[in-house]
Amino acid sequence: ALDFVADLTGEPCFWTAGKSPARPYYTGTTGKIMPYFLCVGQESHVNDYVEGANAALIAADVVRLLEGDKAFICGKGSDTLPPPTCLSCQTRVATYSVSLPAKAVCYFNVLSDHATPGDILNDLKDIANEVLLDSCKQMHKTALELALKGADVPITEKKGRVLTYKDLVETAEQKLGGRKEFARQQKAFLQTLDSKTDMREA
C-alpha cells in the first residue's frame, strides 16, 4: 500500500495567466464526470405511433431536466463551477427510416468539487426515474388525444425501468450464464470496432 504525503496538481489554470512566472501548485482540483444515458424505446412505424415508444422523446426529457440543473452547481463567487451541459444527443439509427427510433443516447459534462461518483450516480438515477415517468405520461396523453379524435388506437400505459451500467452488466451475465461468457462476448464485440472509434460513440 502507498502512504500519500500530499496530493498536488500542476494543471494550468486561466486565472494564473499574466502573473509572475512561478510554477503554481494547487491543493485541490475539480472533479469531472461524463454521465452517459442510453434510452431504449420501442420501434414502430409512424402510422402505429401509439404502439411504439420514441427513444428520442426520452432522451429529450433527460436533456430538459439535467441541462443547467442548479442542484449540481458547486462553488461560490469566482470559484463557481459551470452547471451540467449536454455534449451530445442523438438517435441510433443506421439509415433513413420512418419508424420511431428505438435507441437514443446523450452524455453530459458534470463538474463537482465535493460529490463522489456514487453521489452523482444516485442523483442521476433520480432524474432518470423522473424522466421515465414524464415520458410515459406524455405517450399516454398522446394516445388519449388520438382516441378523442376518433382514432382506433390502443390505450395502454407505458412502463419502463432505470438500470445503471452495473445493473445492466449483472443482467447480461445472468442471461449469458456467467461473468466469463459475458467478458468473452464483450471482448469479441469490441474487437469488431475500428481502433479509432470513440468509445462514447460505439
Model feature map: region roles:
Residues A17-K19, Y25-T27, I33-M34, G41-A202:
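Metal-dependent amide/peptide-bond hydrolase catalytic core
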Residues A1-G28:
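Acidic/histidine-rich catalytic neighborhood of metal-dependent amide-processing enzymes
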